[in-house]
Amino acid sequence: MFITFEGIDGCGKTTQAVLLAKYLSDLYGEHRVVLTREPGGTSLNELIRGALLGLTDYKLDGITELMLFIAMRRESFVKVVLPGLLAGKIVISDRFTDSTVAYQGYGCGVDLALVGMLNSLVADVVPDITFVIDASIELALARTSLNGFENHGPEFYDRVREGFRTIVANNPHRCHMIDCKSDAAEDVYSTHDRIVALFRAITQDKLKVAK
């Protein structure tokens, strides 16, 4: 099974991905769960991620950014995601193809057909379940120290947020929007509980993973 978490920077998706990975690891065993992230997931990608995060005043144009992230996705897909799925594991990814559509497509204005074509070329797998964590722009920006490739203004994040909402509306069979209201610990775990309940409802106890 392939599960992805999506949303704007600072929405809380990384925390929720980690919490779900722990929950499923406790349920099925750590050896049956793979947690990865984009950009990142491999030693090479993590080096590139670190370099990108260090770019405080350097701007990439939309096409350059798209091609860079697409190449990193291919590296992660063939080294982490696909092997995990072929081994029958539950793979959880903090970001996947929907992020490219929302960020480079809706956010940067790159042609959506081009984004879709490149996504399909490098990763011909569609997630089984996608949780889109929706948070206000104000809350998200307050949570994160914006730098490097994340250094964009509120208007950009408005476009990206609307992009994610459009993706959810267009893919109701796999995408599920989860509202995140605050940073409070009780809200974080309440969100986790909602995700677990939704996961159980979606799978309907049909997920059979050998321990």
Swiss-Prot record:
Keyword annotations from UniProtKB, A to Z: ATP-binding, Kinase, Nucleotide biosynthesis, Nucleotide-binding, Transferase
Pfam families found in the cross-reference section: Thymidylate_kin (PF02223)
Source organism superkingdom: Bacteria
Gene Ontology BP annotations: dTDP biosynthetic process; dTTP biosynthetic process; dUDP biosynthetic process
GO CC annotation, single: cytosol
GO MF, one example: dTMP kinase activity
Enzyme class (EC, first level): transferase
Entries under PANTHER family matching the protein: THYMIDYLATE KINASE, UMP-CMP KINASE 2, MITOCHONDRIAL
Protein family membership: Belongs to the thymidylate kinase family.
Name of the protein this chain belongs to: Thymidylate kinase
Native source organism of the sequence: Anaplasma marginale (strain St. Maries)
